[in-house]
Amino acid sequence: MGDKTKVQVSKLKPGRYIIIDDEPCRIVNITVSSPGKHGSAKARIEAVGIFDGKVRSIVKPTSAEVDVPIIDKKTAQVIAITPDTVQIMDMETYEMFEVPIDTGVAEEIRDQLKEGINVEYWETLGRVKIMRIKGEGE
């Protein structure tokens, strides 16, 4: 995949996504400060990694451009669950994925996963993460 695009720092908002240290992250907080008469305003961006949950922060001029991941949100069915991985099948392309449980499944749904249920998964930068369980008819 590796899909990403460039966005100006001044256009970013909390809740959007950014790539920091080659890791797609969700922006939690942005603070902008003006240094004074000369020089451009700087933005401090705090974000949490989608896959690893680590908090990262960067400081950039508001006029700078940063990489933003293109996230594909799709539906899949859980085919099999092993102690280390979950095997899912995309409902449109029937493509199969092996997703590691520790980094590829959102913590709050790990206990609720069962074979045969539908889940929403995100695919970005060649990685897959199961984000939530989909209800009937979604």
From Swiss-Prot:
Annotated Pfam families? eIF-5a, IF5A-like_N
Superkingdom assignment: Archaea
Entry's localization field:
Cytoplasm
Which GO-annotated molecular functions does the record name?
ribosome binding; RNA binding; translation elongation factor activity; translation initiation factor activity
Q: State a GO cellular component annotated for this protein.
A: cytoplasm
Q: Which PROSITE patterns match?
A: IF5A_HYPUSINE (PS00302)
SUPFAM superfamilies assigned to the protein according to its UniProt record, in alphabetical order = Nucleic acid-binding proteins, Translation proteins SH3-like domain
Query: What are the boundaries of the signal sequence?
Result: none
Recorded hits in SMART domains, A to Z, give: eIF-5a
Chief location: cytoplasm
* GO term, biological process aspect, one: positive regulation of translational termination
Keyword line? Cytoplasm, Hypusine, Initiation factor, Protein biosynthesis
User: What HAMAP family does its record include?
Assistant: eIF_5A (MF_00085)
Q: Which family does it belong to?
A: Belongs to the eIF-5A family.
Which purpose does this protein serve, as stated in its record? Functions by promoting the formation of the first peptide bond.
PANTHER family in the record: TRANSLATION INITIATION FACTOR 5A FAMILY MEMBER
* Entry protein name: Translation initiation factor 5A
Organism, as annotated? Pyrococcus abyssi (strain GE5 / Orsay)
> What are the leading ranks of the lineage?
Archaea, Methanobacteriati, Methanobacteriota, Thermococci, Thermococcales
Q: Which gene encodes it?
A: eif5a
